[in-house]
A protein has these predicted regions:
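Non-catalytic, mostly N-terminal accessory regions of nucleic-acid modification and defense proteins
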Residues: 1-201
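Conserved S-adenosyl-L-methionine
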Residues: 179-229, 233-235
């Protein structure tokens, strides 16, 4: 059963990777492959946050009998999205899309200081606002492509999303002329580290240089498979 689950997850991750890599092809040419991650990564984060927010809103509406005020309370959401900063609202903009994306992500970071401080603002705003590299038409194509799928937890659980993103990072690393080791650790190395650590239920796994969280996700998978008879809720903090 565990093997079938893993195979299903890998198939889903590969499908999502293919979808994300199509986004890379949209900006190929104006953007060198060494810089793909600087555009795809923040946009993926932004779309994911917005879609998870929508899922949480829907759940809150159901549990409250349709109370929109209740559904919009910060307590109902993992991340707060200020007015005008949701993916769909930026999608409806007709010009200066790069600046709109940067502005929305900055405001989301400000609204979530305990969880997103320094996360979204680390991405270069100059790359998004330089129309000589990416004009509004290209950014529009990128937004519309990612809008074809919902990227929330219901469609893509965290571990599957992590797997797809890791495959994408590996592709970036393989194609990059830069030092790939700065942002990608091979899955085989991550898996070996987790097996050596042998985390147990109730313990905390700490990765001070977690990057995209690949080792933390592998630790959760390890616990879920090795201790399958002990139902435990695992959290990434």
């Amino acid at each position: 059963m565990a093997k079938k689950t893993i195979n299903k997850e890998l198939t889903g991750a590969q499908d999502l990777y293919n979808f994300l890599f199509e986004a890379c092809n949209i900006i190929r040419g104006p953007v060198s492959q060494d810089n793909f991650k600087d555009y795809i990564t923040p946009l993926l984060y932004y779309k994911r946050i917005s879609d998870v927010y929508d899922e949480e809103t829907e759940e809150a509406l159901i549990s409250s009998g349709g109370d929109k005020e209740y559904a919009s309370l910060p307590e109902q959401h993992r991340f707060v999205i200020p007015d005008g900063c949701h993916w769909q609202e930026v999608r409806e903009r007709t010009e200066n899309l790069g600046a709109a994306i940067v502005g929305a992500m900055r405001q989301i970071e400000i609204a979530n200081p305990d969880t997103l401080y320094g996360v979204l603002s680390m991405f270069s705003s100059q790359k998004w606002t330089n129309k000589a590299i990416l004009n509004d038409s290209k950014i529009r194509d990128l937004i519309e492509h990612l809008s074809k799928r919902k990227l929330g937890n219901k469609d893509y659980p965290a571990d599957l999303m992590g797997d797809a993103y890791e495959i994408l990072l590996k592709k970036f690393a393989d194609d990059s002329k830069a030092q790939a080791g700065e942002f990608y650790t091979p899955r085989s190395v991550v898996r070996l580290l987790v097996h050596i650590l042998d985390p147990q239920p109730g313990e905390t796994v700490y990765d001070p240089a977690c990057g995209s969280g690949g080792m933390l996700i592998e630790a959760i998978r390890y616990l879920s498979l090795i201790h399958i008879s002990e139902p435990t809720r695992h959290s990434l903090i």
